[in-house]
Amino acid sequence: MGVWKLVYHTSNCKTIKCRWTYVLKSDGRYKARLFVKGYTQVQGIDYEETFSPVARYKSIQYLLTHTALQDWEIEAMDVRLSYLHGVLEEEIYMEQLEGFVAKGEENKVCRLMHSLYGLKQAG
């Protein structure tokens, strides 16, 4: 899948730990996701900036006023944004997954090529 590649661990490469999360969906299926513990990332070292799209208060106020004047109804929805397919610009290293350590490559770490859940770069 090309999400990461195994590389030798050097003394100057900081690694991030990861964990699995498991969810039972409403249709009875199970879903597993690999999360990186991105809360250990330090701004200015591991990433430059983050962005969270937020609407201006005046824009929301205008939208609600216009909706009320037109006697329209509003429905709410949640849009989850995770940029998992974007190529990483920074070099980020993750420890190998517990229980999935590559045989004969125990001293290597995963260099992330794409974002994973939990990374600051994942949105």
Please give the residue ranges for each predicted region:
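Long, low-complexity, charge-biased intrinsically disordered regions
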Residues: 1-123
